[in-house]
Amino acid sequence: ILTENNVVIFETLGENFVIDLNNILKELDDYVFVTSGDLPLLDGNIVKHIVDAANSEKTWTSVITTKSFQSSLNLIPECIVSFNEENYVHTGISIVNASKIKNMNSIKEDYLIINDKRVCLNVNTNSDFKLLSTF
């Protein structure tokens, strides 16, 4: 189904997410929407919102939520970033301008704050599935 809809699938060595992603991005010369496959509520409307809201001048824009929003959904956030005296949680979604990535040097990350359950409810465990079924 994916290839029938012109979705490009990349095979990697499976070393780790960061190395695999960087190796793929070095080969591309366009904007890339990066997400994990465990966000079952991610839909076309929220993807369009993210793409429209991302700053095309930035190399890397990560979608984050406030920690308080995730806590209100009874989620236990793992990857937290702090700025402006607030705690935020990475969702695993990014918009990347791959044409600006030619090596594995550190890249300045821009943030897009979206407090929406479609970007933060993932399914990795039975407890995640049970929590998801309450929405």
Question: Predicted regions: what is each one?
Answer:
Residues 43-127, 133:
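Conserved core of the sugar-phosphate nucleotidyltransferase
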Residues 19, 127-128:
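An acidic, carboxylate-rich microenvironment
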Residues 3, 131-134:
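N-terminal hydrophobic targeting segments
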Residues 1-34, 40-45:
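Short phosphate-binding loop-to-helix
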Residues 14, 36-38, 65-66, 98:
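Beta-hairpin (beta-strand-turn-beta-strand) motif
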